[in-house]
Regions:
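Central hydrophobic cores of alpha-helical transmembrane segments
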Residues: 53-63, 109-114
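Membrane-interface helix caps and helix-loop-helix hairpins in membrane proteins
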Residues: 27-29, 72-77
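Short helix-perturbing small/polar motifs within transmembrane alpha-helices
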Residues: 4-16, 20-21, 74-131
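Interfacial segments of multi-pass membrane proteins
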Residues: 49, 62-67
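Conserved small/polar residues in nucleotide/adenosyl-binding loops
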Residues: 152-157
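Individual transmembrane alpha-helices with interfacial aromatic-anchor signatures
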Residues: 137-150
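Membrane-interface helix termini and inter-helical loops of multi-pass transporters
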Residues: 130-138
Length: 158
C-alpha cells in the first residue's frame, strides 16, 4: 500500500512539474486572451491515472501563481482560483468520461478541457475587457477554445 501511494504522489508531482515547466517556458502563448496552453494537453492523463487529476491541477496552480507573481498572467490571482478550478473540473470529468469508450478509445474525455477552459477563462477575459459578462463572452470563449482544440486534435489516435 505504501509503495502504491508513493508512486501516485510521485506521478502527480512529475505531472505538476511537467505542466508548470511547459507552461512557463511557453509563457508568451500560455497567458492571454488568445492562448495555446500546450500543457493543458496533460489534462487527458487522468484517463490513465487518478494521480494525474492532482498533478495537472497542481501544475496549473503553480503556473497561474507564477504568472500572477511575475505579471505574465494579466488576470492575476483570479485566474489562480478560476483557472485552476476549471482545470480540476476538466481533469475529474475527463477521468469519469474516460470509462466511456467507442472502439476502445475514450473520445468523450477530450471535451471537458475544451469546454471548461473556454467557459471559465472566456468569462474571465470578457469580464476583464468589458466589466461584465455579455455577448463578447462568446468571442473570448471561442478564442480560448482554439488552443485546446488544436492540442487535443494532435493527441488523438488516428
Amino acid at each position: 500500500m505504501k509503495n502504491r501511494t508513493l508512486r501516485q504522489i510521485t506521478a502527480a508531482g512529475v505531472i505538476a512539474a511537467a505542466y508548470a515547466a511547459i507552461s512557463l517556458v511557453l509563457a508568451p502563448i500560455t497567458f492571454g486572451a488568445v492562448q495555446c496552453r500546450v500543457s493543458e494537453a496533460l489534462t487527458l492523463l487522468p484517463v490513465l491515472s487518478p494521480a494525474a487529476v492532482w498533478g495537472v491541477t497542481l501544475g496549473c496552480a503553480i503556473t497561474n501563481g507564477v504568472g500572477a507573481a511575475t505579471g505574465a498572467n494579466f488576470l492575476g490571482l483570479i485566474d489562480l482560483l478560476v483557472g485552476t478550478a476549471a482545470t480540476l473540473l476538466a481533469a475529474i470529468t475527463s477521468r469519469l468520461l474516460g470509462k466511456i469508450r467507442f472502439g476502445g478509445v475514450p473520445w468523450l474525455s477530450v471535451l471537458p478541457p475544451i469546454l471548461f477552459n473556454a467557459v471559465a477563462i472566456g468569462a474571465e477575459w470578457c469580464y476583464a475587457a468589458t466589466g461584465s459578462i455579455n455577448v463578447a463572452f462568446w468571442a473570448f470563449a471561442g478564442q480560448i477554445a482554439l488552443g485546446p482544440v488544436s492540442y487535443t486534435h494532435l493527441t488523438l489516435p488516428t
